[in-house]
UniProtKB/Swiss-Prot annotation:
Low complexity bias locations: 9-52, 115-148, 211-231, 552-584, 617-663, 812-829, 843-860, 1065-1077, 1213-1223, 1243-1255, 1292-1316
Assembly and oligomerization: Component of the Set1C/COMPASS complex.
Coiled coil segments of this chain: 359-400, 717-744, 1177-1255
Organism: Dictyostelium discoideum
SUPFAM superfamilies cross-referenced by the UniProt entry: RNA-binding domain, RBD, SET domain
PANTHER family, per database record: HISTONE-LYSINE N-METHYLTRANSFERASE SETD1
Protein name in UniProt: Histone-lysine N-methyltransferase set1
SMART domains assigned: PostSET, SET
Compositionally skewed regions (Basic and acidic residues) per UniProt: 53-64, 532-542, 1179-1199, 1224-1240
Purpose: Catalytic component of the COMPASS (Set1C) complex that specifically mono-, di- and trimethylates histone H3 to form H3K4me1/2/3. Binds RNAs which might negatively affect its histone methyltransferase activity. COMPASS recognizes ubiquitinated H2B on one face of the nucleosome which stimulates the methylation of H3 on the opposing face. May act to regulate chromatin-mediated events.
Amino acid sequence: MENETIVDNSLNNKSNVNNSNNDINNSKSNNNNTNTNYNNNHNNTTTTTTINKTEEKQNDSPKDSEFEFLDELKGVDDQHHVFSSEDESYTNGNKKRKQTDTPLSPNQDLKKRSITSPTTSPTTSTSTSTSTSTSTSTSTIINNNNNNLKDKTKEEIEFIKHIRSQLVKPKFLKDKPNFPLRSSGGNWIFVGKLPSLQSTTTDNTTLMSPNNATTTNGSSSNISTTTTTTTTTTPTTKILYRVNGFLSDNETIDSIEINFGDPRDRYEIERLHSSRINNPFELPCVSFKNPLFIKSNIAKDIGISNEYGGMNDSFEFSNQPPPPSPPPPPPPTLPPPPPPTLPPQHSLEQQSTKQQIFTQQQQQQQQQQQQQQQQQQQQQQQQQQQQQQQQQIPKINQQHYSTQPSVLIDDIYDPSNPTEPISPHQDHYPNFIFSKLQRYEHLPTRNPISQYDYRDRPRDWERDRDRDWERDRDWERDRDRERDRDRDRDWERDRDWERDRDWERDRDRDRDWERDRDRDWERDRDRDWERDRERDRDRYDRQTNFSPAPQSTTTSASTSSTTSSTDKNSNNTTSTSVSATTSTTKRKSKFSEPIEPSPFAIQIPRDNIKINGNLINNSSSSSSSGNNNNNNNNNNNNNNNNNNNNNNNNNNNNNSNNNNNNSDVKDIKDKLLKQFKIYDPVNVYMDESYWYIDFRSSESRERAIQVLNGSFIDTWKLNVDNKKTNTINEELQKQKQLENDSNNNKPNNFNLLENERSLKEICKLLVATELLSTSSKDISKNFIEAEILKTIKLLDSQRIDPLTQNSTIINNTTNTTTSNINNTSNNTTVTPIVTPKSIISAPTSRDSPRGGRSSSTTTKKPSKLDLNGSGVPPTLKKLDTIKQQQQPQPPLSPLKRPPKSHFYSDSEDDGNNNNDDDDDDDDDEDDDFDQELSPLHSSRDSKKNIKSIIKKKPIYSDDDDDHYHHHNHHHNHHHHHHHDRSEVELYNESDLQVDVLDSDNENQDESDYHKSSDNFGHVELSDDDNEFDSLDTDQDLYDTEENDNGKKSNKRPRKSKFNGKSKKPTTTTSTTTTATKSKGRSKKTTITTPTHNIPVLDEIQSNLDDEDASYVSMVMAADKDIKLLFSTKSEEGFEDSSQEILSTPTRTKPSRNRKERNLPFLDEEDDESFKQLPQPQQKQEKQEKHEHKLKNKELKQKNNEVIINKTEEHFSENLNGDNNNNNDKSENENENENENKNENENDNNNLNTSIDNINGVERRSITGCARSEGYTRSDIQKLFKRKQVAPTGKRGAASSASSGSNSSSSSTAESFETGGNLSKSARSSRFDNRGFGSDPITLASLKSRRKRIKFERSDIHDWGLFAMETISAKDMVIEYIGEVIRQKVADEREKRYVKKGIGSSYLFRVDDDTIIDATFKGNLARFINHCCDPNCIAKVLTIGNQKKIIIYAKRDINIGEEITYDYKFPIEDVKIPCLCKSPKCRQTLN
């Protein structure tokens, strides 16, 4: 029965297709039949039995999943493309999608869900199955719609285009819009596309790709196996569009086809019409910008069915079902009916074999199918009747729930996010509500679309516009009102706040002003009160101090009327000093009492500190005893006037004049004390030029200078420096001298010219006190006689500096002392004049048989003291020659004793002081031999002070006279010339002047030492006779050239700790000193060739690393290198090679005129003292000169050529290493003796000889003056003390930094760990790891390797050091010089430097507790930068008892290349970047 019903329906549909141009009722019946067929097909699919596997696969569609439609894709016409806003969220969710075998078509997107209808194919012409009937009915309606659209007017077609152009894709509406629909599906309308529309409109033709219509070729396997024929349709004949508002962004078309077999599509279209209440003809699509209007004929063409609440003929929503169609006629039994014909639009194909087989099967089952169709029709009629009676939606059939796909089991309905049904089978979605009729029951009846007038549309638009405008106007008005109200409120609030703020500010300001005013008033009041109190107290003190002064002066004048003027002055001095002390004790102030001056003092020029724009009156303050000077002046005036009233008046006047100055001086003292309070000053005083501040220690003084130099007090900039003058000591000396002059009886007639013995003793005393080799400042420390002091100062002032050719300027202290002595000498009418020639000629002679030389010298040279018949010094009468000779030198007072040098350690100074007595004992052993020698060389005092004398002021000696004396002495005694070493000095014309070996300040410490950046020459060896004697003279010359910039060193020669008790191997050396003149400045180059035994190589290498050991062995291998290693050269003459020296062996003839040589001695032309001599003495001196010149001329002519040849041979042997160190002692002595004989015989430079006899061994002096060449001994105990390798300490002093190997660095690190005192910062670690080393190289090698360098801007960092000459590998570059401090001081200084912002660190460790700080005091070595691939290395060398840091060249350094070495910082977390830019750069310093 069912099969018969299907066939009838198909025939009915065919008849309806043929009558497609009938009225609307036919159309409605067609729609009803379509729906009926759909429902029947839907119900029959579950009960149909499968004939074969292919049938089951096609007909059992409800059992398949909703996504299995991909396997049945046949083309565009057989698909239902449903677009929904939920598609994308559903696809992107966690839902599992079943994979299919058939791939998607190229134009199909995953976001578009395609549902295949239960029909087999919409293009099949005939079908006996249920699927065929449905597709046939569907295609019938489509064809009807297309045919209806053909008759439409042009206006309607244009309107369709307008609708098409208004469609928009609202993908941007991500949030849920306010849809008037119950489901969240798209808003759909139906538009038909005519075949002619493709040719007229180009935009619609591109909506569908031909690929969508022609994709059925590859899906033939899904077609039903029934005997039906399939035909392909062109996209232009049968394409319908469904407009969707929710398309994805990657969609290219806005509409797709629709099949009316799906009731949901019709249902959605109906809801679009019924959603708008006011105007039922507008489409309320949210996605459309403008509402759309559909005419009645378009609504008819849509073919809306009223089965689910569609519209009837009058376009009213009706719930009544349409009238039932007449039952179809019964099918003929025999023969079977032909298959239905296809519509004329479709082009059919011939049936395939499968279709024929299927038709045969249908014919066999025809009766069974007709019965099924009849049963179906009866069931449908019953259902329709029930629906009409109940007027409600039929219940959902739940019979297929068991066959629901597993994918949709978890698909539960969510009211907030409803899920759209994806298939036309409503039974699969029980949770989805299809409320079709209930939704529209409350809606009023709408007017038909035909009654709508287009003229109403503008009116409605104007009405809405006016309404909206009024609404917006009210809103803007309210908005402006609220804005103005808020603005006014804020303005008032801000106004009040500003008013309150200003009021509070003024109130606070007034209150602060009143407070400050009261405070200032109280401060000024207290200050004025204190000032008045001090002024009154000072006035009272002055009255008490000066009131007894007239009485003391009157009594002294009355009682001592018969005494001399000098006695009066002495009495006045004592009385005024007593009054001054009594007045100051009442003050009970710490700084008011006269305190004995401290040796640790600083000076500040008085020009820096001015009061009221003027300097303080000198009379008001001259040291701490300034009041005494004022009283002395007043008392002197009173004594001269002999009037008490005048005395009082003078005192009052002076007090009034000095009143203001005293208060100003006190203010300055207070300010200075406050400024230097942190360093614990002892006393503050001043003299004519400086303010002085005494401290308790040299460390406090140095710190005060370092920190406060350049600081300001108010607007005064302080120029702080070490105390240079010694005014207070001079005042004490003047007082002592006045006492001595007053107490001693002075003989009237005493002539030194007639008393030669007294003259000798005076000279011996001067030599013992070193007055002949010291400056006028040092004379004041060892005060002797006023007359001798005056004479030496007079000669000192007349002396012309041989280097600068300028007269020396005596400072204020010297002038003051000289003036004081002149006053004393004027009173005693004594004018002594002592010639230097007499003093030098007999400095230390004793009563010996060889004293005739001194007596002959004095008879020929005027060396006597001319007293002009006015008397002699008071102490000459008491001179006892024996007592003066045997009496030891009194020790210096604690104030006069020089402080310990800051550069050297305390143990060294103590050792020097303690060993003085031992050296005296050693010197006493040679007294027997000294008595037999000439006084010039054999004096005990001369032996002790031979080196210190050279370092003092220059010795002005006439070389012509010395040569004559030595020549005469040589012919008289005929001693054999036997010696251990020979010394040859070749001088130029200007070099006959003895260089200035001077040092003005005995208290000079290391601060002065480090002020010159290149003060390398300050390195000194132990000055004992056992030290390296061959370098003594050259060392002094070197010091002279280093210190000729004004920074002098006056240190006494330090004694050796060994005291000559440890015997060292003897050494014989040959020293040659050459003086040349270059650019107006004399330079001396001394080459010392050692012939002593070389230290054992194993002993040296034991304390050295591999590199140093190889270097030492290489040096020891050649005799030439050994000589150069132990040779000494001055840094200025170092560039002169040996060939240059040998190229100019001849020397110009020195001038014999004293005036040409700029010697400040007695001459006939320019010396006034020479003219004061008696005429017999002048004649005698001229005659001596003439004889002296003749003898020298003869001697020079004889030996001119021999000395040159021998000198060249001597140099060539020394430089080429021809001398053999293993020669016997006899051979060396013979060679030296022969060379010295030839040199002395051929002396072309006015060189003289002298003979010494020490322990039976004769020694010949080359220069004729032992002072100029250094005293040498051949005694075994005191001959030579060889320098040894420094022992290795805890920190590895011998571990050199030159190797740069891992072994040396690791050993250094281990030694550091054992020390346990590692620094905690990278800055302080810099001086821990810069490198250590030790070398047997002495000071001689250091001086010979000195190079020319300069500092300028560096590419690495700030400033750098650059080479000005080519430096060979392993040559010395420079010494690292700075302040020598202890570890604790270094730690404190580092913290202070960090606080001051000093970024660079210049601390260099020497040993465990010795660090060199070059931050403020140092030389150019402080500018050497770090490099990971350096060209230099740092070594620590032990020279004498001192350790020096020497920078050596690691490789050859070219001119202009920067000098660098490795800082060797430890590894730390905080890295310091490296800027060396070398290929081996480690990027960090630590």
